[in-house]
Amino acid sequence: MAPFALLSVSDKNGVVALAEALHRTHGYALLSSGGTAKVLEDAGLPVTRMSEHNGAPEILGGRVKTLHPRVHGGILAKRGDAAHQADLEQQGIPAIDLVVVNLYPFRETVARADVTWDQAIENIDIGGPAMVRAAAKNHADVAVLTSPDQYSSVLAAMAESAGRVPADLCRQLALEAFQHTAAYDTAISRWMAGEVELVSSPWLEAVPLRQTLRYGENPHQKARWFSHPRQGWGGAIQLQGKELSTNNLLDLEAALATVREFGYGPNAVGPAAVVVKHTNPCGVAVGPVVASALTRALDADRVSAFGGIVAINGPVEAAAARELTGLFLECVVAPSFSPEAREILAAKANLRLLELSPDAIAAAGPDHVRSILGGLLVQDLDDQVMTPDQWTLATKRPPTAQEKQDLEFAWRLVRHVRSNAIVVARDGQSLGVGAGQMNRVGSARIALEAAAEKAKGAVLASDGFFPFDDTVRLAASHGITAVIHPGGSLRDGESVKACDELGLAMLLTGRRHFLH
C-alpha cells in the first residue's frame, strides 16, 4: 500500500509543491480536507477527501472534520505493535505516515482592531492541534510538519532516504510541533486573559530552540539560543565562520542597535559602521560610502577594535571587505554582501558573516526582554528618535551649525553605551567612549583621555544629567566646545553657569537614556 500523507493547512504557501513532490516523486497518497483539498485538486493532484476517508461528513459548520478514529487511529498506531496493527486491519484504517498541519490564524485574527469575541473563538483550532500532537507523540513512525519553512529540508532529507523521513529528523520535527502547539495555546490564553485586563507579554509564549551555542559568556557555561524563525536574529543567515557564541550574539545585538540609529538597508540615511566590544561601541562613524564609514569607525579606536564585532547599515562591497580583512574580527552583520566581498572575506574562514534583512528586524516586535532570577523583565525598546527642535538651549551661547550636527551624532550614540555613559565626537566619528563607571565624571575622564588631542573642538554627550559641574569643567579643560545631556538635576544651574563661564554651549534633551 502507498504511504499516506495528510495535509490540512491554513497557510497554503508551498503546499502544492510539497504535495506534488510527495505524490509524484515519493508515491504518497494524499488525504486532505476543506480549502487545502480544493487547492490540491485545482493543481491537478489526486486527493482523497476527509469525509470520504472517514465515511462521515463534516458537521457543525466545519467544527468537526478530522476528529475521527480513522484519522487519529491512522496517526497514532505504532507500526511495531501487533495489537495496533490488528486494530487497523479489523477497522480497515490505513496508517498515516506524514502529517502536514498548520493551525487557524488565531494571532492574526485577534490582532485586528475590529475583531469580535465570536470571531476570535471561531479561529481557535481544535482538530489541527489534535492531529499535530498525535503525530508528534508517534514520531517514531510519523513525520509532522507545522510550517512551510520545513518543507524544503524535509523533501531534501527524503530524497536521500528512499522517500522516508529519517528518524532523527522526525524527532526534531516532533519537538518543533509541540513548541508550535504550546505557543498556540499560550496565545489563546494570553488573549483571553487580556479580555479581563490581565495583559501578558508575547515573550511568555513558547519560543522555539534555534540552536545550542558554543558556550555561554564563559567556556564553562552551557548556552542555548531560542528564537522565532524569520524574526530578528532568528531570520539572520550565517554565510560563513565558526558557530556563534552567547557573547557574539550579545555584541551583535548592541552593534545592530547602534548602527540602526542611521537607518538600515533601504532606509539608511547614509552609510554608517559600528565596532563593538563587550556590548559597548568603541568606534562609530558615518561616511560618503560604506568603505569610508567602516575605515573611520575602525580608526576611532583600532586597539579596542581588535576582536570586535562590526555592524554596517548598507551592502558590503569589495572595498569594505578588504578593510575588514585588515585586522582580527569576530563577526560582521550587514543587510547584504556582494559576491566579490564574500570571495575576499572567505580568506578569513573563522570570521562570522551574517546577513540580516530589514524585514527580519521589523518582524521582531517592540519588546526588550531581560531575565532576572526566576522571571523576565519586558520593556519597550528605547528607540524613539528625538530631533534637535525638541531640545532646549540652556546656555547664553548657542551651538554653531557644526556643533549642533556633532551633538546630534553624539546623542544618537550615547544611549547605546552602558551607563554611566559619555561620548566624545566630531565630524561624524566617535573619538572617545566612557562606559559603565559608577560616577559620571569617571566615564567622562575615560572618554576624554581616549580622544586625547582630538577632543579639542569636539562635543560631549551624556546619557544622564550632570549632578555637579565637575564634568563640564573637565570637558572644557580638554577643549570640548559643546555638551548635550538630559538635564533634570537639582544642580543643573551650576553646570549651566560653568558652561557660560567657560564658553561652552549646552543643550538639554529632557530625556534620559540609561542602559544597564
UniProtKB/Swiss-Prot annotation:
- This protein's name: Bifunctional purine biosynthesis protein PurH
Q: Which GO terms describe its cellular component?
A: cytosol
Which parts of the chain are coiled coil?
A: none
Domain MGS-like: from-to ranges: 1-146
Source domain of life is Bacteria
Asked if Membrane is a keyword of the record, the answer is: no
Q: What is known of its domains?
A: The IMP cyclohydrolase activity resides in the N-terminal region.
> Any idea of its EC number?
2.1.2.3, 3.5.4.10
Keywords associated with the record: Hydrolase, Multifunctional enzyme, Purine biosynthesis, Transferase
| Pathway(s) | Purine metabolism; IMP biosynthesis via de novo pathway; 5-formamido-1-(5-phospho-D-ribosyl)imidazole-4-carboxamide from 5-amino-1-(5-phospho-D-ribosyl)imidazole-4-carboxamide (10-formyl THF route): step 1/1; Purine metabolism; IMP biosynthesis via de novo pathway; IMP from 5-formamido-1-(5-phospho-D-ribosyl)imidazole-4-carboxamide: step 1/1
Catalysed transformations (reactions): (6R)-10-formyltetrahydrofolate + 5-amino-1-(5-phospho-beta-D-ribosyl)imidazole-4-carboxamide = 5-formamido-1-(5-phospho-D-ribosyl)imidazole-4-carboxamide + (6S)-5,6,7,8-tetrahydrofolate; IMP + H2O = 5-formamido-1-(5-phospho-D-ribosyl)imidazole-4-carboxamide
Q: Which family does it belong to?
A: Belongs to the PurH family.
GO MF, one annotated term:
IMP cyclohydrolase activity
Q: Which GO BP terms sit in this record?
A: 'de novo' IMP biosynthetic process
Q: What is the lineage of its organism?
A: Bacteria, Bacillati, Cyanobacteriota, Cyanophyceae, Synechococcales
Native organism is Parasynechococcus marenigrum (strain WH8102)
By its UniProt entry, which Pfam families does this protein fall under? AICARFT_IMPCHas, MGS
